[in-house]
Amino acid sequence: MQPSNPNQFTEKAWAAIARTPDLAKQAQHQNLESEHLMKSLLEQEGLATQIFQKAGCSVQRIRDLTDEFISRQPKISHPSGVYLGQSLDKLLDRAEEARKQFGDEFISIEHLVLAFAQDDRFGKKLFQDIGLSEKVLREAIQQIRGSQKVTDQNPEGKYAALEKYGRDLTLLARQGKLDPVIGRDDEIRRVIQILSRRTKNNPVLIGEPGVGKTAIAEGLAQRIVARDVPDSLRDRQLIALDMGALIAGAKYRGEFEERLKAVLKEVTDSNGQIILFIDEIHTVVGAGATQGAMDAGNLLKPMLARGELRCIGATTLDEYRKYIEKDAALERRFQQVYVDQPSVEDTISILRGLKERYEIHHGVKISDTALVAAATLSARYISDRFLPDKAIDLVDEAAAKLKMEITSKPEELDEIDRKILQLEMERLSLQKETSAASRDRLEKLERELADLKEEQSRLNAQWQAEKEVIDRLQSIKEEIEKVNIEIQQAERNYDLNRAAELKYGKLTELHKKLAEAEAKLREIQVGGRSLLRDEVTEADIAEIISKWTGIPVSKLVESEAQKLLHLEEELHKRVVGQDEAVSAVAEAIQRSRAGLADPNRPIASFIFLGPTGVGKTELAKALAAFMFDTEEALVRIDMSEYMEKHAVSRLIGAPPGYVGYDEGGQLTEAIRRRPYAVVLFDEIEKAHPDVFNVFLQILDDGRVTDSQGRTVDFKNTIIIMTSNIGSQYILDVAGDDSRYSEMYNRVMEAMRAHFRPEFLNRVDEFIIFHSLRKDQLRQIVQLQVQRLQQRLSDRHITLSLTEKAIDFLAEVGYDPVYGARPLKRAIQKQLETPIAKAILRGDFFDGDTILVDVGEDERLSFRRQVELATV
């Protein structure tokens, strides 16, 4: 049996009462008594446990005492039913009286808890045992309820709403859990100024993502705690509203609005003591709106206008425009505070302020040069994000990487471990051998193993010692930080004795320990070769930038410097002749990697001019293969596809309102994903002249704005354009160097006739490719044969051509007008097809060497090398 009329109770209170018969049955009791209700309330983990915690009681102790009392009651083995006991009946009557005292409409959990104070059967004794008086209980209930009344059947969601749906930033600042905020004084001062107004005292922080809007609110919280604010803001609480928690779990219509109203009521009832901070304030507009329902923004409006609610908002420029500007009534209630991206110098100061926090967290040191590098390199190479966020991320990731290296086994030790494993496997197999040579080898191996194991244990001991000291340093630094926070708290509370005791006692001792640990680490590192690095340097930051963007930022390693010095030779392995073109491209790369290129323009921009088939596109491919080890790093755009005026939208993206607007452009998307690339615009004369207007910004400033309004950075690209314009003039003077300048002028005239001067004027160099000579064609034959050889290597077939065969192919494939392409066709016809047929006939097998020569009939002959050897 249960008490009647659930409509008198709130949902949670009725759920607790409805659970009591089950608990009584489990305990084999026939009567429902007050102890069963207490057990039910404690099982809920809801308001009852909150009240006891607020009153300073141990919930677990109350649970244990309740269970103990229940277990002592007489049991009935098979109770036919359960009946309402006297104690519970009286308790419910007292709860009804408590409801009337509080002026509520329903009996709630707190009324039931309060009724236990007068319960003669169980409650009084329980509260005596745990030392809880009715007065303390009432105070705890009052603190949780605040000024809320029970006006519906689900009031618990509205109690201590700010505690549930907000983070107290001032409390976090007192505990030292917020990162220090450096600079931003003007913005914080403006926020304080707006908050001090009589009406419309609501600043909204607007700025790009990552510039530090939330940090300004945290900075204000720190100032409030440090009492570095005007009297109007002294001892105020700054609470960040968690919109996610507010919306989460609001199942019924109107539940979200009720929660928000409860939060706003607490704020207004505090008479200006509480300042609300809503991060991502645009989420408030439209939040909780269903058909015909008010959204959260409309609930805020009246209070914002009257000055009852002091609220700081933060949102990005785009979202402010999209959501808040559309709602003019909401917009006028907020005063805008623009937060700009800090300069590189300011970012360095911010990083210096945060340095200690990151050092303590990761347990590594961060050098000042690393901080400067993080600010300068991120500003230069990461264009789609904002300072200081991107610089802080760099430092954080570099420190995390170093910490990971410290905790994992050093490379030297790892190599020795592998070597020992290898030798032990060899020893096992040698032990089974009986020959004298095997025994000698075994003896030698045993000696080698003993030496290696000795070295292994020495390195292991050193690694553990270094790691131990580094960990100790981290724990001492953490201790120092805790003591510093305690000192600040003592000074704020004017407990100067405690502050002095900590400052001149504990802190001095910790600094002494820190100095000792640092000296010990230096001793280990200087005495023996150091296995671990414990400091983040400029090189670490450069490495992280390279991982993020693919741009080689790190200082040149000697091997890479040598590789760059021989860049021309590398390119000539693929591109025959064309010395001017190859050296111009090589010099541009050398300038860039040595750090002498103009940082505000592309690395280099070229127009390759010349007849077809002389190596213009091949040079671009060779360059991409050299720089990125793959030809696929070449962003190739065939300009013959851009013959119409409107085709430019394919490069930078379709304008708003057109199909494909969200997809971005072929060129801009490729460079956003891979900012360090070789961009090849093939056959530029085929494109519509208006398409080249896009190139003006790319070539001059190294950037272009796509259809979405994003700036795409071309400063780390090499731009190569190829064209056949004027190729007839180049062919006319083939092999005649004396007429070169005349030919160059005529080609440039043809270019000027076709392209606009403002486009041509922005290109770094015009490089003319000459038509190929016969001796160069022989080299190309050898290159093409090498490629064919690679394809045959899968079948282990080797290809060998005599000098006569090479001359024959060069002669057949020579055509000055078409360059090297006819040669490719000749090799296909004269060499590849006959070999393919011979393999299919079974003339050649895997592992054969095919000798290619010119037969008496002036055609290529094919035979096995082995046959030749036996003749």
Curated annotation (Swiss-Prot):
It comes from Thermosynechococcus vestitus (strain NIES-2133 / IAM M-273 / BP-1). Keywords: ATP-binding, Chaperone, Coiled coil, Cytoplasm, Nucleotide-binding, Repeat, Stress response. The gene is clpB1. ATP 2 binds at G610, P611, T612, G613, V614, G615, K616, T617. Residues 342-550 are annotated as: Linker. Belongs to the ClpA/ClpB family. Residues 84-147 are annotated as: Repeat 2. It comes from the Bacteria. ATP 1 binds at G207, E208, P209, G210, V211, G212, K213, T214. The Clp repeat (R) domain probably functions as a substrate-discriminating domain, recruiting aggregated proteins to the ClpB hexamer and/or stabilizing bound proteins. The NBD2 domain is responsible for oligomerization, whereas the NBD1 domain stabilizes the hexamer probably in an ATP-dependent manner. The movement of the coiled-coil domain is essential for ClpB ability to rescue proteins from an aggregated state, probably by pulling apart large aggregated proteins, which are bound between the coiled-coils motifs of adjacent ClpB subunits in the functional hexamer. GO terms for cellular component: cytoplasm. This is Chaperone protein ClpB 1. Residues 160-341 are annotated as: NBD1. NCBIfam families: chaperone_ClpB. Residues 560-771 are annotated as: NBD2.
